[in-house]
């Protein structure tokens, strides 16, 4: 899918645990301006969301497994990949693409974004998780959704 990039993350493990770099400024043309972390229980879907002003996102699953789904709103093309413990990669999503993720397991998820969130002027828009272009990409048919994502469902 044009513009979407997989960024392999090198994980260093020993008897103490592991260490991984999840962001380097040199990976991107635009600087990441905010970092967010969420915890999601197995079966949660967050999204699909998009930003009309073109915010870019980098998604990294810090613990557990997440299924990332991206929808090109112009072409209808889709991208999906399971990331996390077994597949330590970051997924870079350029602006104006709808994106979301499903918690395949309980997970800790990190978002790096190119715009700071402004609660007075949020650039947050939704595509239903069960939109015909993406509904078959999820592993669950009865996800746990936020009120916002429930209202967006078709």
Task: Give residue spans per PLM region.
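Non-catalytic, conserved peripheral segments adjacent to functional cores
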Residues: 1-89, 108-154
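Conserved SET/PR-domain catalytic core that frames the SAM/AdoMet-binding pocket
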Residues: 86-105
């Amino acid at each position: 899918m044009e513009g979407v990039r997989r960024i392999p993350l090198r994980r260093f493990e020993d008897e103490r645990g592991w260490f991984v770099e999840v962001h380097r400024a040199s990976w991107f043309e635009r600087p990441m301006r905010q970092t967010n972390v969420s915890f999601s229980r197995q079966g949660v879907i967050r999204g699909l969301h998009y930003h009309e002003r073109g915010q870019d996102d980098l998604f990294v699953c810090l613990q557990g497994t997440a299924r990332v789904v991206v929808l090109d709103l112009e072409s209808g093309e889709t991208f999906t990949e399971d990331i996390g413990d077994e597949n330590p990669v970051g997924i870079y999503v350029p602006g104006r693409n709808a994106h979301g993720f499903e918690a395949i397991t309980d997970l800790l998820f990190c978002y790096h974004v190119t715009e700071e969130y402004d609660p007075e002027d949020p650039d947050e828009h939704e595509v239903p998780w069960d939109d015909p272009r993406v509904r078959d990409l999820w592993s669950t048919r009865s996800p746990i959704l936020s009120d916002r994502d429930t209202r967006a469902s078709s």
